[in-house]
Design a protein with these regions (language model features):
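Alpha-helical scaffolding within the catalytic cores
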Residues: 62-74
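Basic/polar, cationic surfaces and motifs that engage anionic cell-wall
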Residues: 1-12, 16, 39, 52-55, ...
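Active-site-adjacent loop/helix micro-motif of nuclease/hydrolase catalytic cores
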Residues: 17-21
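Short Gly/aromatic-enriched secondary-structure transition segments
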Residues: 22-31
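Extracellular protease catalytic domains of secreted zymogens
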Residues: 36
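Short coil-to-helix leader/linker segments, especially the first N-terminal amphipathic alpha-helix
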Residues: 24, 55-56, 66
Length: 165
């Protein structure tokens, strides 16, 4: 068990407008590598925000300030034992080639509501994009700038130089 320190925002890296199911996420992450998966023991995210703004729980968790072993997800190497991970469906252009902020208005509203509610419940959280911890464009938007725009306190914004953006 470790202290919960971070909320890391991800995208599914799927083409703009293409919906994704939780079963697809589970397959992508937990199927063996020879069957097209990553071979992980568990999924990489706690929740997923669908195109219509619906937030679907993928891994249950409690609301305390700790990550129990059963709550760990595989969202960012080296950070999983102290982070919660949320993903929005999308993140690349319609051709599936370039990183793009494809969040629908409903997804933006849902993510904003989620972040604000959870920083109230977890005031110690620092919120980051996956790109802060891996050489990826994920979640395909500037998390720090967006957090400032929606009025998140500076103490809750992870500000270390990103790996990629």
């Amino acid at each position: 068990m470790a202290n919960l320190e971070y909320l890391i925002i991800h995208c599914t890296a799927t083409p703009e407008g293409r919906e994704v199911t939780s079963n697809e996420i589970y397959r992508w992450h937990t199927n063996p590598k020879d069957k097209g998966g990553r071979g992980w023991s568990r999924v990489g995210y706690c929740e997923m925000i669908h195109l219509d703004g619906t937030i679907e729980e993928l891994v249950p968790y409690n609301d305390d300030h700790y990550i129990d072993n059963w709550e760990v997800t595989n969202g960012a190497r080296g950070m999983n034992h102290k982070s919660r991970h949320i993903v929005y469906v999308g993140g690349v252009d319609k051709k599936g080639k370039k990183a793009k902020d494809t969040r629908t208005e409903a997804q933006k509203e849902a993510l904003e509501m989620y972040v604000k509610a959870h920083t109230t419940l977890q005031p110690q959280w620092r919120i980051a994009g996956h790109y802060h911890f891996a050489a990826k464009a994920c979640p395909s938007f500037d998390v720090e700038e967006w957090l400032k725009e929606i009025g998140i306190k500076q103490k809750n914004i992870y500000t270390k130089k990103p790996t990629v953006l």
